[in-house]
Amino acid sequence: MMTVDNDTNLVALTFAQEKEGVEYFDEAKMKQTLADVRAEKLTAWVDNTKDEPLIAQLPKPGKIKKETKNDVLGYTELQLSNGATVILKKTDFKDDEVRLNGFAKGGKALYGQADYSNMKVFDFAANACGLGNFTNNELEKALAGKQANVSLSLGMNWNTVNGSSTPKDLETMMQLLYLHFTALKKDEKAYNTLVNMLETTLKNRDLQPEAQFSDSIYAGLYAHNPRFTPLVAKDLKNISLDRIMQIAHERFAAANNFTFTIIGNFDEQTIRPLVCQYIASLPGKEKAVASPEARTYFTGKASIDFKRKMETPKPYIAKFLGGDIDYTLKNDIMASYAGEVLSQILLKAVREDAGATYSIGAYCGLQPRQEGKARLQVQIQSPISKPELVDTALQITNKCIKDAAEKVDPEMVAKVKANFLKDADVNAKKNNHWENIIFEYKTRGIDTYTEYKKIVEAVTPADISAFIKNEILAKGNDLNIIMRPE
């Protein structure tokens, strides 16, 4: 075995982008790094894979109390003895896929400002934990050769658990689900590794103009609400593994308020005993908790226009429009139409005709809120080709939206409609698409599948113009964010 025990014929190199504020490796640091490596005491690798089952003692199985079928959406709903609901939808879309999704009311909105930083890293930290008798690293080794995973997540108003497996490893996925609810294990080593990785990633973030532009978008869009700010380096000083573990236990202590969907290629009969063994056996005495509406949005007309030093001068613009609207399938479809049509209009006018941008697109969609409402949000974002074309690009964008509120090209609408119908047929054969369909149906009572194509077919160019005029422009909310080079 060859080792380098002196500096003869040794060259150490470091490559880094030259930028103000960036910390570089100097000669002293490089020498110290080499010395640290040589001083390490290395031991031979030992395979310490644990030769034991994931669950040392299986829980007493629960029971299925009731079964009902939904013939419209093609699933079977099971009511379990612990109060949990399980929805089974067998498909043949992918031979090697079974998907798990669980959801219950709760989420980040239940926690105040003292936990904002913890909320930003919750998903990372919770999934760096161990399970049962296994550390995170030991768990990875124990699962080698298996295709099964489960993870926890907190949305703004929902506690969620997601997983996937092959049919062969379905029971392993169910065991992982059980352990996430009952035996989440604090793993300081894995947590510290995560924090170190985040520190490295975020260290030079603020030096990037794109990050500063993103921060301005968050601040403007969410009305400077500190809950809605991106993860930055200083957040890492305010996070606590103990607190994150406590929150995880609070949100995932019991399963009685959860609905679990299992979709994919599984055996209809053998899955029921697994449901009883690993889901019906979970604790089930938690009171339902509905979280408050936490999202705040800008209102009225506003502009954030600032300059930043850039090595390569490249301005950015972002425009936001919209307001509150009823959360319905028709409005969701109309929003999608508006976004696609505006994208095509802007691409031609701002990029192709004016040459003012490298690329431009419009996203228009509904962000669900409480009590059957949603926030209709139009987002137009673009890097501008030349600093002197910023105002021109905005003027053209504003004119295009105003003109679209009066009339849109029927041929353009026909192309969008054809794409929507084609995508609907493709998506109908995807397990993750059915997860979304069932989630919307169970949480908001909206069937986004049965009437979808019928509504898409019926939309006319006049409908789209009326939607842009009445539901976008008439709201009177218009936010422009502009970042120019110094």
Region annotations inferred by a language model:
Residues 1-2, 9-17, 87, 94-127, ...:
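M16 family metallopeptidases and their MPP-like homologs
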Residues 251-253:
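Conserved alpha/beta enzyme-core scaffolds, especially Rossmann-like or related mixed alpha/beta domains
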Residues 1-113, 256-261, 266-309, 322, ...:
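Proteolytic maturation boundary segments
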